[in-house]
């Protein structure tokens, strides 16, 4: 697509120069354009080329996003608006969308009003105390807001990745069991695995 657009611009440039050449031959009084005039023309053409490249890159990203949202919506049988929210917020918080969808599926089954037996809330099953670490003024009902819940849940997972030196397995276990508990088990030489990370990642460890 980009190559085709560049060819269009190049064709326009060649046509313009050809027209100028015919004009020179048609009149003995014609004056060759100065270097400055030609230079401005070339710069203008390259500006057009770069503009087309930028527009094509943006269009390509938009198409990739639309295709991904359609794919995840079909895979998990969830509405497109929820799919788009999970996809966009995961990316904005530094989480791969695939993990974002798997996390929400395991945690809440994509149910906005999900409440666990220990009081974890919403799509990502956050506890209010954890959410208030990021936004101290939050109320319980705020965690049923789609954007708030997804954003803070994914941010919490991203922060756990840093705590556990980018070990995604331990970060997921800490998301489920709590970081203090996972560190305690590891310090005692134990294995904190409880099946949760495997449920998200699809493989045992």
Spell out what each predicted region is:
Residues 1-77, 205:
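N-terminal secretory targeting signals
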Residues 48-205:
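Catalytic glycan-binding domains that act on GlcNAc-containing polysaccharides
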């Amino acid at each position: 697509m980009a190559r085709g657009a560049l060819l269009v611009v190049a064709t326009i440039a060649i046509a313009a120069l050809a027209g100028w050449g015919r004009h020179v031959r048609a009149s003995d009084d014609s004056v060759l354009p100065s270097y400055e005039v030609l230079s401005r023309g070339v710069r203008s053409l390259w500006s057009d080329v770069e503009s087309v490249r930028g527009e094509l890159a943006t269009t390509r990203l938009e198409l990739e996003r639309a295709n991904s949202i359609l794919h995840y919506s079909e895979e998990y049988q969830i509405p497109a608006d929820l799919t788009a929210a999970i996809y966009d917020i995961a990316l904005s918080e530094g989480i791969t969308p695939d993990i974002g969808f798997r996390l929400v599926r395991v945690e809440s089954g994509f149910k906005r009003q999900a409440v666990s037996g220990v009081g974890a809330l919403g799509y990502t099953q956050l506890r209010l105390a954890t959410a208030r670490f990021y936004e101290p003024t939050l109320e319980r009902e705020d965690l049923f807001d789609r954007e708030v819940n997804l954003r803070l849940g994914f941010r919490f997972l991203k922060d756990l990745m840093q705590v556990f030196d980018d070990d995604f397995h331990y970060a997921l276990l800490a998301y489920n069991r709590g970081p203090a508990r996972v560190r305690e088990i590891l310090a005692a030489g134990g294995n904190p695995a409880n099946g949760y990370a495997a449920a998200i990642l699809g493989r045992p460890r």
